[in-house]
Amino acid sequence: MDGKGNETFKYYGQDISYSKVTELVAAGPMLLQNGKNVVAESKNNYKEGKINSSTGQRSAIGITKNGKVILLTAVANVDKLALIMNDLGCIDAMNLDGGASSALFANGKVIKNAGRNLNTVLIFK
């Protein structure tokens, strides 16, 4: 969240001061930033080869220009995931965890079950 309470995504690389951070999710690679597909750039900064190249179950989070948060779980590689998030109207989007960690629950219904027990989850009300 920025200082005005708006959801935001920022790429800080290695240089970040945590003194003013109130909420933080570390994930990657970035998919979209300010409406631009940044997967190619993100792959250079995100060295986990399997995440950069393989197709599998993935989760992503994005924000539209109107501030709407989009959560998605799909079978895709990060290149395809960026295209999907762009098609859904996101201007900023980030790949989250994938594989057996991907799960999605909405409106009290299971949309995609996780393949294992999860230690950490994102919850929006």
Question: Model features per residue range: what roles?
Answer:
Residues M1-K125:
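Gly/Ser/Thr/Pro-rich low-complexity, intrinsically disordered segments
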